[in-house]
């Protein structure tokens, strides 16, 4: 079999076992090492990078073994890169004194980046109520924008209902619970910190802290 025939066969086999979307993503993604100075944080990133015991342990691991899982970044028009997933790994690498961080570079739209950022961080073992609140809000808004762009003939309520249901299906929380979390984004920072701190002290107090906080979210700041 000639080289051209073999290449054609491989292309055909690849087409059978992968989708067009997967092939397109593969073409626009690659891995390289980047310095921390080249990577900006995701704007309004809802997940806190805390200097806690978990971070100390992660930094020690990175110092000993390196960064085992690459971060995900997207290229920006000015030639820099924006972190999508891997803020804690980047910070751990800095604490460990590493000059660069392995990164997957992928072309993503603003809404695609938001959805990937939220989905990747929801896998954490410990997530604060405030983090979930703003993460769910950001992802829901991104999903609604995508729905409006892809289904312009639908009534306005259509994409909204579908987005709420889809978000719940992609998350560990119900539609009702997600709505409760999003209500927390209306709280003043001091009250939101109180909710977070109560959960940090005792994880089992989530529902106990969430109920009054949601009720307070309906009050105006003056009230």
Q: Could you say what each language-model-derived stretch is?
A:
Residues 91-186, 206, 211-218:
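Amphipathic, charge-rich alpha-helical segments that serve as recognition/docking helices
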Residues 66, 71, 143-147, 189:
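Structural motif corresponding to the C-terminal cap of alpha-helices
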Residues 221-223:
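Short, intrinsically disordered, charge-balanced linker/junction segments flanking boundaries
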Residues 189-211:
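Short Lys/Arg-enriched helix C-cap and helix-to-coil transition segments
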Residues 68, 99, 174, 199-201:
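Short coil/loop linkers at secondary-structure junctions
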Residues 1-106, 112-125:
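Short, charged/polar connector segments at secondary-structure boundaries
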